[in-house]
Amino acid sequence: MISESVVDLSRLQFAMTALYHFLFVPLTLGMTFLLAIMESVYVMTGKQVYKDMVKFWGKLFGINFALGVTTGITMEFQFGTNWAYYSHYVGDIFGAPLAIEGLTAFFLESTFIGMFFFGWDRLSKIQHLAVTWLVALGSNLSALWILVANGWMQHPVGAEFNFETMRMELVDFGALLLNPVAQVKFVHTVASGYVTGAVFVLAISSYYLLKKRDLGFARRSFAIASAFGMASILSVIVLGDESGYEVGEVQKAKLAAIEAEWETHPAPASFTLIGFPNEEEQRTDFAVKIPWVLGIIATRSLDEQVIGIKDLIADHEARIRNGMVRYGLLEELRAGNKSPEKIAAFNEVKDDLGYGLLLKKYTPNVVDASEEQIKQAAKDTIPSVASMFWSFRAMVGAGFAMLILFVCAFWASARKNEESKPWLLKFALYSLPLPWIATQTGWFVAEHGRQPWTIGGVLPTHLSASSLSTGDLWGSLIALIAFYTLLLVVEMYLMIRFARLGPSSLHTGRYHFEQLEQHAVKHASPSQADPQQPVNA
């Protein structure tokens, strides 16, 4: 068996690379649509300021896009290096949407992004606008296929286990594509990216307004970001509610951990606003509850129960026992006893083989597992409650803070008095980290909440890892952290540098720092203006 330290280090390495990568992805998703909207306004109005907005914000987008691509490449290699059995077991299914993403969406995006930056003087207005919209389409199609793959990991549909090949095989591509978990995850994730882009533009525009510079540019950027952000944050909240319903349908252990729902209470269940989960005692101390809310969100009804952790553990224990039976039948089939009776018996409990594989963490002989090992494996099916509970509330808290921000910003922009509200501009500026807090904690909830599974109910995480040494993993982990941190420092340096320069970085002669230089030259000292003229003339 692969040691637990190897599995944990492999998980840590993948989590680190994924979280670093997802620092860049949401901003890319959001900025592409903001750029497309800004350029659409430019084409419709013909006003030069909107073209300058596209070019300036596009410069910041380009920096972010380049580093996002760089950090994303490493993740794909890890499926082969760190998760070899995972790649063998489900590679034909998981690889299909990733291959489609690379051959279609990424090529579309990467091709047209060059035309976006270098086609201003070579394309007509309409042609360049089409290019910008195609960049936005490509980035969102990339997200679609990647999240189809991830959604299948959360809720594996359209695939069956083949005992002849000992692998999962795709039997229904339509079910894979239309997986409700994948679709909800896609729209919720891209909407969160739109919010990230809107907060980014809003915060930097507020900085310019506070500094009283490039006001026309900043006002228009503020207005577009506030309107786009308002629509996006409302979408995130609605789609987040839908995501909660899907989790309640197919990932009951994740939902119970998020809500620290230890017991199965009478319907409709109350929502725990805040509290302190005590995992040892299996209770939540000092819980503040809102009646009915959890039941309505998770079940869309007033009479369906939300299953508690204790009952889920008991249910999973029964499924582990079924999995032991199926594992025994699988061994007989592999030994050559492929009678119709054996195959029929195997297929009757085929959905529970993954639960039987949970015992591999404790014993190589699944069918001979002890009662203690079965009970421990059943407990493992519940992710860490405290980390899930607090991460979810951090995500929701950041989301509602941004809702307040966009309501205020949209109202002020509609009344054209945002400059007279320094408290709002400071609120927007200091809110810049909020979308990253929300997206990072949201992904933690999504991925950590799937544990102990790599593929929900099918393949346990401890079986998915490659046979590596801890030394190899520590070395590569340290190298990746150093490299990714360097990339992050480069991104921050370039972003801050160009954000401070603002549209003056376009060198059009129309903006703040360029006008200061022109003013300085115009009022240069006499000796500079005319070397033949006396200094005190």
From Swiss-Prot:
Sorted UniProt keywords: Cell inner membrane, Cell membrane, Electron transport, Heme, Iron, Membrane, Metal-binding, Oxidoreductase, Translocase, Transmembrane, Transmembrane helix, Transport
Keyword Transmembrane: yes
Protein location: Cell inner membrane
GO CC annotation terms, alphabetical: cytochrome complex; plasma membrane
Cytoplasmic-side positions: 1-24, 117-131, 210-221, 415-472
Transmembrane segments: 25-44, 97-116, 132-151, 190-209, 222-241, 395-414, 473-492
InterPro entries: Cyt-d_ubiquinol_oxidase_su_1
Catalytic reactions on record: 2 a ubiquinol + O2(in) + 4 H(+)(in) = 2 a ubiquinone + 2 H2O(in) + 4 H(+)(out)
GO MF terms, alphabetically ordered: electron transfer activity; heme binding; metal ion binding; oxidoreductase activity, acting on diphenols and related substances as donors, oxygen as acceptor
UniProt binding sites for heme b b595: 21
Pfam families: Cyt_bd_oxida_I
Enzyme class, broadest EC rank: translocase
EC number(s) on file: 7.1.1.7
Cofactor(s) listed in the protein's UniProt record: heme b; heme d cis-diol
Residues in compartment: Periplasmic: 45-96, 152-189, 242-394, 493-537
Co-factor binding details: Binds 1 protoheme IX center (heme b558) per subunit.
Bilayer topology annotation: Multi-pass membrane protein
GO biological process, one term: aerobic electron transport chain
Positions with a binding annotation for heme b b558: 188, 395
Domain of life: Bacteria
Record's function text: May be involved in maintaining the low intracellular oxygen concentration required for nitrogen fixation.
Quaternary structure, from the entry: Heterodimer of subunits I and II.
Family (UniProt): Belongs to the cytochrome ubiquinol oxidase subunit 1 family.
Designated name of the protein: Cytochrome bd ubiquinol oxidase subunit 1
Organism from which the protein derives: Azotobacter vinelandii
